[in-house]
């Protein structure tokens, strides 16, 4: 992949955010941070749902209005995500760097 993807990633004061950034770097994906409005895709860290629900809902709403893919990442070590997130997600993935990259490439139709 040669194109740089603009990503909005939900942030928080939890370890999940730091670990996700490490996994994203390991994926080999070329990306840069963006606002929800300017992003090519929105990444929702489901582990932040309890503390950042309003922020997440705002980003999801913007993504849906703009027909941007929403990739939800399961809480670290868990299989389930909140049903509200699963219903609006383009894909739900775990923490494998290659799965994260593949989900983004598939959602954005990148070869």
Curated annotation (Swiss-Prot):
The keyword Magnesium applies. Keywords: Magnesium. InterPro entries: ThsB_TIR-like_sf (IPR036490). Its cofactor is Mg(2+). Monomer. Not known. Could have a role in a phosphorylation-independent two-component response regulator system. This is Protein MTH_538. It comes from Methanothermobacter thermautotrophicus (strain ATCC 29096 / DSM 1053 / JCM 10044 / NBRC 100330 / Delta H).
